Amino acid sequence: MHQRSWRTLIAGGAALAVGVTLTAFGAPAHAAGVPGITSEARAQDEVMNYAVNLTADASHYDFNAAVSKASENGVVLAQYPEFNTFFVQSVKASFAPTLGKSLVDAGISYQSIGPTRFKTVTGDEVRTEQPQTTASEANAVADAAGTHTTGLSADSQLNDFTPDEGDANAWGLTAIGAIDAEQVDVTREKVTVGIMDTGIDPDHKDLKDNLDASRSVGCQVNGIPNQDPSAWKDDHYHGTHVAGTIAAAHNAYGVDGVAPSATIVAIKTSNEAGSFYPEYVACAFDWAAEHDIDVTNSSYYMDPYAFWMPNEASQAAGLEAASRAIRYAKNHGVVNIAAEGNDNDDHDNPTIDKESPNDVEGAAVERNVVGGIDVPAMLNDSVVSVSALALPTGTDPATATLERSKFSNYGKNTVDVAAPGSRIWSTLPTWKKDPPFGYLSGTSMASPHAAGVAALIKQIHPDYTPDQTIALLKKQAGYTYDRLAVPEDGKEYRGAGLVNALAAVLKDQPQPVVGNLEYSHDGATDWRPLADARVSGTVYVRTTVYVRTTVSGPVTKASLQVGDKEPVTGTGTGAFTGNEVTLVAGPYNATGLISDAPHVEVTVTAEGRNNDTRADDDVKDSIHFHVDESLHDGGAWTNSADGWKYCYSDGYCARSKYVTIDGSTYYFNGDAVMATGWVTIDGTRYHFASSGAWLG
């Protein structure tokens, strides 16, 4: 499990407060804290959840003191000291300004305090033990606790998704090469994908074997983790559909996922009404960071605002809390993938929103959202944002030029990659449909294609950081960038390109690294660099192949060949750590290595973990060394009819070589005759004296 950090992982809180009217507080008797953005008192007593974000430099002591003060007027919910955020439920109308004053008076600075939603907290989320000092407060708590939501709210974002009928055709898998990728023979390490959604059906035959119930959780009651299976079981169908696209098993049933051997974890992030509130989102990302989740998928926008305004007092705290949690997850090893959204909006330039707030029917108003943030899609420093693609009618998904789905949001600076999102065939809950499969459309369906590819990359590169994984995801998407239609309407949606499952398992593979080639006269001591060396007598040649810990990747097999001698081979485990192969070739007599070539070639071949011939994981390295013939026993000058030669007792005469004799260098041509005068050797002119000694 990842270790928690006390360091706050977000900065710039003071900048967010510019231009905001803050509640005026009386002067304290000691050094005051600095107030942040604070929501106004509510019109009446009603149960509400609040996000409280202290400043980045708040101490552990300040955090605990702030929690204590908040508990005086409410019930403290989830606490995240690792990024200085906590949530509180209170019935008191003046909770936010009252807590703000209390913190400032105590010398505690904060970034923001404000509600997490528009709708009053009701039903199972109401904490009746909270402080109640008036009849108005008591009545508000009782009324809220007695009100229960059944089914989706009228304006829930999940109402956009209705399963379509049709023949099974998971065209998206073909388009990104996932079917071919599944057949590549390569070792895949364990990887876990967290599905932040409406839950997962644990009984689905295509999902249950890949589902890790021990790490699954529900965050939809005040953002407090609950691992009871009833808390994370899908109560819609959206989450089950997303899960199937990512990791439906390869089991001769239904459909395959992009990464069919990945483990999935349900992280239920929506409530029964279909709302994804900030406290749920913070819970989900913190859970991923603390439970060894490698990749997350977020196919939603954070309710109740399509765009959250950083300087709006009713929205700043919820936005800040979620942003901190998402950044915390990334900084703790999690690759976060998110859907761009389905409003045909320019995410580079948000202007008008008519959908928010969406958790109370009829409450939405038209508002200016310039500078607003769609969470999590527009948090590009912490997530990979995915646009949706459509397959033109009658085309082959393996080769077709794909188009932007008409509903997909877009933006040159906000879209990271593109993936199939229109009419995507995947799993549905067993209680929803028989057989439990169907089509859905949306960027919600595109994002899991990208999450599946990210999972494949992590299976191949288990030691990659999120930044490395994302960089490779984008690089490989660029290999098929030309399969995306140029947006003639100016709505740039392509990002780095089309996510590429096949490239994830064939290209940019981890490679073994070949260590220094050395030689020794006794095979045990005094190993010296071999490249371009001049050696004589009896020599050993050695090389060591190191695994990733030294530079890069693992080795499964290696060979070392000296000249035309029989190669020496060895095998490795393919593990990324603790795996090296040492090869020692020899002993060889130097005279026995002499040939017509001017040098001896040494070749090392190292094979990686991928057995597919198309993969780029194997390494071949060659160097040369020279045999210094001047030190060979029996060498002597011989004057032949063709000229002077230098021959040995075994009858061999130096040819096509430079030889140093008694301190002077001579060159002997292919006929073993000593060169004199000007001679062209390998395209270069050299000058030798009449005695044969090299002049330059």
Regions found by a protein language model. Name each.
Residues S39-A41, V76-L77, I293-Y300, S382, ...:
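C-terminal subdomain of the subtilisin-like protease fold in secreted/lumenal serine endopeptidases
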Residues D197, V334, G362-Q459, D463, ...:
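Extracellular S/T/G-rich loop segment that most often corresponds to the catalytic His/Ser-adjacent loop
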Residues G146-S261, C283-D286, E290-A317, D346-P350, ...:
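Active-site core segment of subtilase-fold serine proteases
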Residues V627-G696:
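Extracellular adhesion/carbohydrate-binding repeat motifs centered on closely spaced tryptophans
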Residues M1-A31:
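Secretory targeting and sorting signals
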Residues A243-I246, V265-N271, D294-V295, A419-L498:
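Hydrolase catalytic cores
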Residues A32-E40, N64-D167:
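Autoinhibitory propeptides
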Residues T269-M378, W431-P448:
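Substrate-binding/access-modulating region of protease and related hydrolase catalytic domains
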